[in-house]
Amino acid sequence: MNKDIDIVIYGATGFTGQLCVKYLKSVDDGITWAIAGRNKAKLDEVAKNNELEVEIIVADCEDEEALGLLTKRSKVVLSTAGPFHRYGSKLVASCVENSSHYVDITGENFWVKGLIERHHEEAASKGIRIIPSCGFDSIPSDLGTYFASTQVNAPIKRVESFHSFKGGASAGTLETMFSMGSLGLGPEMQDTFLLNPKDSFSEEQRELSSDRVGIAKKEEIEAWSGPFVMAAANTRVVRRTAALLAERQENYGTEFTYQEHAFHASRWSAIISLFSTIAIGIVLITPLKHLVRPFMPKPGEGPSEEVQRTGFFDCKFIVETEDGDKSVFRMLGEGDPGYRVTSKLVTECALALVKDVDSLPGGSEYGGLLTSASGLGETPVSYTHLTLPTKA
């Protein structure tokens, strides 16, 4: 199959898609790339505004023939077109059918679960890497845990991560959360091992992996912990990584568990966070969402340049080995996490699948429905100049 395009950015007219376009143009080192979406006029505008000389491909997310023409020519498809459960399923299916690697920025694990069930075996047999969640959801959690594990050189019993960040609210994430609230996903949302293969965890590991985290003082990092709004997305990805690594005989540890929290400087801040998280949950599952939704950022909108520039994320990891030793690692990133950091990360993931595929984890023939850590290793973080976790 003659693939004459290295990377296609699908959803290039959206806010995050346009950031990916700008970033890829800034680091372009001779690759062939294109922009794609469903609206020719908007794609033309993106090309004009960014002074691009790249191919424009029109392909609606429901047009299987157009998607097929796109994926037959593309080595890697980078998608920012969410909510992904609405707009992404046929694109992923086309990537698997036509042997194109794929990355995106979804946090919709219930959708990823469906992809695993439908496409993992075929993608694995073809050596095609389908890697969702390559943005702020869930690379800091996933690659932070992965890299910390390489530094302790011992089987890991437990990792707890603690997150703080500053940035604008992601309109796409909010739209996804509102749409998920009406899908009746209770059992799936509560399954802490939703993305894991069957029989890849014990009941004891399940019991130690509850989403019901409260407020606690963490002496190791001199801070308070509380619920983190993205933990339900990130934790499932990290646990799938652990299972996929175990299949390659590279497991974190047979007793490995992972939980995720928000990081707070004071007990009072943690209390406020707890009640805010509860309030968000109530809004999403009740008619209150119809009152709040008109005031939320709309898909396609995003934060100002100032907010993007001054944002950051700060993740701390407490790593406990099976022999009881504890270490603390820290991972930092500059820029608004939901947009600037996310656009850089997912673009570097796509570039890794073009430039470094022969040296990526698992070997050149490895494939399936993967995670950033199991499918890419440390490569995306090192290229974006984010700070890899260092021992605190």
Q: Where in this protein do the model-derived segments appear?
A:
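N-terminal Rossmann NAD(P)H-binding glycine-rich loop of SDR-like oxidoreductase domains
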Residues: 9-23
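Active-site-lining helix/loop region of Rossmann-like oxidoreductase modules
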Residues: 10, 150-315
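Conserved glycine-rich Rossmann-like NAD(P)H-binding loop of the short-chain dehydrogenase/reductase
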Residues: 30-39
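Rossmann-fold cofactor-recognition segment
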Residues: 50-62
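Conserved Rossmann-fold cofactor-binding substructure of NAD(P)-dependent oxidoreductases
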Residues: 59-73
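Glycine-/Pro-rich loop/turn segments that contact NAD(P) or position catalytic residues
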Residues: 84-191
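C-terminal active-site/capping subdomain that shapes the small-molecule cofactor and substrate pocket
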Residues: 252, 264-382
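Conserved small/polar residues in nucleotide/adenosyl-binding loops
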Residues: 384-390
